[in-house]
């Protein structure tokens, strides 16, 4: 039972759930509802995200063992062997990848590039070397949203915008939490952007990304037949977050950074919830 719990834990259920929300909503907006293809695509994406995350946990086991925040994870804690974590991640990703190509070639490519950007670009090449790691690695986090659209409509502009909203949100998600746990990242020698350039400069980078996110959220109202509820809720949520981000940037604080991290997740959730309202109301 402990092994099963550990296998579930290495997929980071909360993170996977949030990414699946972006996929599910994107698919429903593209289709106008759900169908049988939706079930196959959803299973595929869930397995792909979970597998990629487990592989990531395997690769990061050494730095996870250093940071107090992560040292109790299954692999550094010794509950799972590194080989078990790697094999589990690779197996479920492979199943997800096969299912993805059954949905469509385009969807299969999106799933593959999700793994590529997360594992190769972010974790292996950039995370331990560059403060700009999430700028390119962040593309992985946007792939589920893009995949939801591509599974239905292929590669068209609205899908890229829906994915770009997530991409622009990622700096707030990653950098705020790295500000709060600054000492952990220093101990593990991870050159996160806020640690290298300072909290103030990183905070203003988040402000600019959020401002662009607001523009893209509004543009979807023009491009897609979404109701007024979408426009009001999405732009209000992002505008409020932008206000709080500016306020934080004027006076950065490690304790408040955790609150901003949580607010960032709520903001993205509201944007995607408003997309659903826009389709059905």
UniProtKB/Swiss-Prot annotation:
Pathway: Porphyrin-containing compound metabolism; heme O biosynthesis; heme O from protoheme: step 1/1. Keywords: Cell membrane, Heme biosynthesis, Membrane, Transferase, Transmembrane, Transmembrane helix. It is a multi-pass membrane protein. The chain crosses the membrane at residues 16-36, 38-58, 75-95, 101-121, 129-149, 150-170, 202-224, 228-250, 261-281. CDD domains: PT_UbiA_Cox10. The keyword Transmembrane applies. It catalyses: heme b + (2E,6E)-farnesyl diphosphate + H2O = Fe(II)-heme o + diphosphate. It is found in: Cell membrane. GO terms for molecular function: protoheme IX farnesyltransferase activity. Converts heme B (protoheme IX) to heme O by substitution of the vinyl group on carbon 2 of heme B porphyrin ring with a hydroxyethyl farnesyl side group. Carbon 2 of the heme B porphyrin ring is defined according to the Fischer nomenclature. Belongs to the UbiA prenyltransferase family. Protoheme IX farnesyltransferase subfamily. This is Protoheme IX farnesyltransferase.
């Amino acid at each position: 039972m402990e092994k099963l719990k550990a296998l579930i834990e290495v997929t980071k259920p909360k993170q996977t759930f949030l990414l699946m929300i972006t996929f599910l909503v994107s698919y429903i907006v593209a289709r106008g509802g759900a169908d049988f293809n939706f079930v196959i695509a959803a299973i595929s994406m869930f397995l792909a995200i979970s597998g990629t995350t487990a592989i990531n946990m395997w690769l990061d086991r050494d730095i996870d063992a250093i940071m107090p925040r992560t040292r109790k994870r299954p692999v550094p804690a010794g509950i799972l062997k590194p080989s078990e974590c790697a094999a589990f991640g690779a197996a479920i990703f492979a199943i997800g990848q096969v299912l993805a190509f059954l949905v469509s070639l385009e969807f299969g490519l999106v799933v593959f590039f999700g793994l590529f950007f997360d594992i190769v670009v972010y974790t292996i090449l950039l995370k331990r070397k560059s403060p700009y790691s999430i700028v390119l690695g962040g593309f992985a986090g946007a792939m589920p949203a893009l995949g939801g659209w591509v599974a239905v409509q292929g590669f068209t502009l609205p899908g890229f915008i829906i994915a770009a909203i997530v991409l622009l949100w990622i700096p707030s998600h990653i950098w705020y939490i790295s500000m709060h746990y600054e000492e952990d990242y220093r101990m593990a020698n991870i050159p996160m952007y806020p640690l290298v350039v300072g909290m103030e400069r990183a905070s203003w980078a988040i402000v600019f990304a959020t401002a662009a996110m607001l523009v893209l959220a509004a543009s979807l109202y023009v491009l897609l037949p979404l109701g007024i509820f979408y426009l009001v809720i999405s732009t209000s949520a992002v505008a409020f977050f932008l206000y709080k981000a500016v306020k934080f940037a004027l006076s950065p604080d490690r304790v408040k950074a955790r609150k901003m991290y949580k607010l960032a997740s709520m903001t993205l959730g509201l944007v995607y919830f408003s997309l659903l309202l826009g389709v059905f109301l």
